[in-house]
């Protein structure tokens, strides 16, 4: 079974994390699939918006650390770097529909999304300090810009998680919804009706 599902519905591409047995821990192969899908969508005039979501209860438990230990993503052109480059430079509206745990990259990728819709019970976590890791995806720059230095420092230095209400208050997410994917689809459909730029 594919660990990244791709569905095109008219002008909307939905990319679904589909590794529920590992709470969608992201592997190098998954990163490369996501990077390739985003690159393709970026060059496809017919695609007007992209949604990233989950097929299960949790958005993602972050990077699959065992996979990363086998081949650390140190080089330019690695699957992780390809994904980060694609998500950072993506020129079309990128919407995330999330629920459950959004750990590590599950939170940091959201800084690169245009609209984020989260379930009320979503927990956001960037536990880099707990793992002895450096924050990824530009998060140590982007998170303080979003929430202010004091709030960002508290989260980064303690590794504490936060909920959807806090995420909404500080502007990390646009909306809390009991049905994040349905809400994200409505937003994507509205975007798709706008004139192309």
PLM regions and their residue ranges:
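Conserved CoA-thioester-binding segment of acyl-CoA-metabolizing enzymes
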Residues: 1-55, 85
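Hydrophobic/aromatic residues within transmembrane alpha-helices
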Residues: 15, 52, 64, 109-111, ...
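C-terminal long alpha-helix characteristic of the crotonase
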Residues: 117-122, 164, 170-197
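Glycine- (often His-adjacent) and acidic-residue-rich active-site loop
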Residues: 39, 46, 54-89, 102
